[in-house]
């Protein structure tokens, strides 16, 4: 059985908290896409754990964790993250972590050229805007993957005669093409290669044929939870291109990033922030560049875990949610951070887009059109009540229930969980 947790907006919805809540019921937690450009925080027994690349199932000592073939791995960051978790009391994480032999490696020069590429794109952009990359080398690594010149984990850990020499030769060719593309930037390949000789031995015990690993687990009745990274609106195909990440962040990325058949996927949980946020540039129809937006940002503590950047804030956009639900096929929803709306007297919700008075039937793929939409709002009454101490769904204020019911009715998907505060236990559940 495979269940999936996916972000429905532009990321930072609180996926990790739901995974943390569910992980005790699963044998394996897997990631299928992205790298250390993701970021979420989990609080367990008062200890805060920051996750970027690693599956958050590591907080459960009885759970195995998998980085699938669709993930791109910056090896130094992987070990740094493992060390940080160990220092905070999570033991034997390296023994509970398995890494796909097919996953591609992010080198330091990928990160360096990521920033150069950002400057280049800004220079040719009509409005001079950045894509908003995290600078972690994710895009350049997926680029070399697509051009069939990248290096995978199995290239690094192979012990056959001549394998290291082949790895080194491919590495140098890859670096040479980067320098031809971006100029002779300052870089020490010998230092990086020496580091990878050491990483090779440390990585080897964790590396598996992930396609066999996960399908064998399915065949043996293991329960698997897939932890999506980023969110649908950052998907390379379905997001607000080019202000997106470089991988498939929706349900398609689960299939291609793990090698799992669609027929094995059971539940798909869509995580939805009760309002909308976005990090970096790109269109954001319901953004509030006013006191309301600042209030959402302040109360919601909207700063990125990975970048530290302020998140842009706006009202819940049900056009976005309906679009992502259509693609990902959510079976139920988790509404997060509902408590951030506690003090708002009125809460507008975006329900449709129009251009020049003409209502749009679908989410615009063209950013010029998207940047010119007028949003139709329905304004719902607030509840003006602290909900952070509430422990049962039925105890929510009537207007909070009406807000949730409006969402359910609009998208036609039941809400199974509601987040009412930052604490681990601040999550209401109801049977759907």
Swiss-Prot record:
SUPFAM superfamilies: P-loop containing nucleoside triphosphate hydrolases. Gene3D superfamilies: Adenylosuccinate Synthetase, subunit A, domain 1, Adenylosuccinate Synthetase, subunit A, domain 2, Adenylosuccinate Synthetase, subunit A, domain 3. It catalyses: IMP + L-aspartate + GTP = N(6)-(1,2-dicarboxyethyl)-AMP + GDP + phosphate + 2 H(+). It holds the Pfam family Adenylsucc_synt. The active site is at residues 12, 40. Homodimer. Plays an important role in the de novo pathway and in the salvage pathway of purine nucleotide biosynthesis. Catalyzes the first committed step in the biosynthesis of AMP from IMP. This is Adenylosuccinate synthetase. The lineage of its organism: Eukaryota, Fungi, Dikarya, Ascomycota, Saccharomycotina.
């Amino acid at each position: 059985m495979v269940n999936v947790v996916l972000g429905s907006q532009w990321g930072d919805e609180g996926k990790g908290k739901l995974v943390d809540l569910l992980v005790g019921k699963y044998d394996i937690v897997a990631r299928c896409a992205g790298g250390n450009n993701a970021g979420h925080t989990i609080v367990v027994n008062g200890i805060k754990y920051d996750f970027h690349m690693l599956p958050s199932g590591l907080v459960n000592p009885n759970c195995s964790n998998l980085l699938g073939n669709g993930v791109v791995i910056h090896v130094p960051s992987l070990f740094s993250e493992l060390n940080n978790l160990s220092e905070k009391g999570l033991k034997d994480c390296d023994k509970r972590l398995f890494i796909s032999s097919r996953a591609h490696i992010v080198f330091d020069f990928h990160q360096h050229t990521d920033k150069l590429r950002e400057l280049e794109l800004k220079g040719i952009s009509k409005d001079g805007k950045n894509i908003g990359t995290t600078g972690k080398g994710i895009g350049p690594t997926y680029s070399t993957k697509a051009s069939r010149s990248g290096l995978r984990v199995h290239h690094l850990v192979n012990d056959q005669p001549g394998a290291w020499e082949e790895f080194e030769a491919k590495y140098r060719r890859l670096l040479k093409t980067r320098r031809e593309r971006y100029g002779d930037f300052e870089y020490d390949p010998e230092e990086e290669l020496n580091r990878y000789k050491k990483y090779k031995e440390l990585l080897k015990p964790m590396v598996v044929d992930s396609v066999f690993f996960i399908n064998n687990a399915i065949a043996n009745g293991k329960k698997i939870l897939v932890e999506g990274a980023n969110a649908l609106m950052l998907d390379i195909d379905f997001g607000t291109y080019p202000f997106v990440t470089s991988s498939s962040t929706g349900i398609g990325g689960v299939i291609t990033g793990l090698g799992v058949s669609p027929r094995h996927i059971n539940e798909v949980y869509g995580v939805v922030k009760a309002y909308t946020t976005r990090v970096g540039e790109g269109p954001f129809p319901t953004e509030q560049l006013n006191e309301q937006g600042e209030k959402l940002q302040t109360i919601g503590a909207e700063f990125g875990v990975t970048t530290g950047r302020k998140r842009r804030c706006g009202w819940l956009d049900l056009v976005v949610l309906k679009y992502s639900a259509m693609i990902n096929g959510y079976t139920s929803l988790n509404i997060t951070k509902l408590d951030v709306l506690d003090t708002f007297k009125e809460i507008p919700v975006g329900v449709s887009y129009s251009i020049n008075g003409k209502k749009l039937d679908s989410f615009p793929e063209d950013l010029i059109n998207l940047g010119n939409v007028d949003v139709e709002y329905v304004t719902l009454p607030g509840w003006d009540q602290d909900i952070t101490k509430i422990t049962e769904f039925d105890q929510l204020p009537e207007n909070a229930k009406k807000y949730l019911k409006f969402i359910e009715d609009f998208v036609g998907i039941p809400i199974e969980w509601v987040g009412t505060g930052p604490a681990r236990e601040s999550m209401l559940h109801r049977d759907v």
